Amino acid sequence: MRLRKKNWTDDFLNQHSFYLINYNNKKIDLKQIFLNNNPTCLEIGSGKGQFITTLALKNLNTNYIGMEKSSTITGVALKKSLKEFENQLKDMTNLKYFNNFAEDLSQMFSSDSFNKIYLNFSDPWPKTRHYKKRLTYVKFLDIYSDILIKNGYLEFKTDNDSLYNFTIEQLNLTNKWEIVINATDLYNNTEFLKDNIPTEYETKFHLANKNIYKIVIKNLK
């Protein structure tokens, strides 16, 4: 997501560096980062942090990482997360943020690092010439398969018809994934809505009567 530069975020991130992951050209050791062996989940494009903060508060024995390209957005998300944990009188020990690009995930993390990956309302990159930048392009699907455990899951949500169709096409180009949920109208499916956690964008789009797609795929390696 795009967000105008906020002058306070750099200082805020420096003051709260404990909650940030820094990549120094070595594989990131998640056990060292979280000081436990709990399952770890990754949200690629964590936005203002509503989704991953809600997950982390609901599942204190699972580790979560929110990844964004923009340090400004990360600052906004981290501030929100810390406030939500404080409001519930809980220490934020299972949620970290970091800035980087999805292209670099295999360099930063070892194989089988994550139990689940979330892609929520990623940039659809609508121009045809930009199709390789879409986060469900087959190159990215291969990266996710590498860093995800066998039989781990990737959850994808979008309101964009073209990105949904593109994602299905890309999944048909690889044998590393099995589609286990393909909801073409999430909010008319009570079964899939039971445990649904909406993002900021999702709430906005749903209130505007936009259709929401959800795909869940299992990593076959």
Swiss-Prot record:
One of its GO terms (molecular function) is tRNA (guanine(46)-N7)-methyltransferase activity. Substrate binds at K127, D159, T199, E200, Y201, E202. Pathway: tRNA modification; N(7)-methylguanine-tRNA biosynthesis. InterPro entries: SAM-dependent_MTases_sf (IPR029063), tRNA_(Gua-N-7)_MeTrfase_Trmb (IPR003358), tRNA_methyltr_TrmB_bact (IPR055361). GO terms for cellular component: tRNA methyltransferase complex. Keywords: Methyltransferase, S-adenosyl-L-methionine, Transferase, tRNA processing. It is an enzyme of class 2 (transferase). The active site is at D123. Its EC number is 2.1.1.33. The keyword ATP-binding does not apply. Signal peptide: none annotated. Catalyzes the formation of N(7)-methylguanine at position 46 (m7G46) in tRNA. HAMAP family: tRNA_methyltr_TrmB. This is tRNA (guanine-N(7)-)-methyltransferase. It comes from Mycoplasma mycoides subsp. mycoides SC (strain CCUG 32753 / NCTC 10114 / PG1).
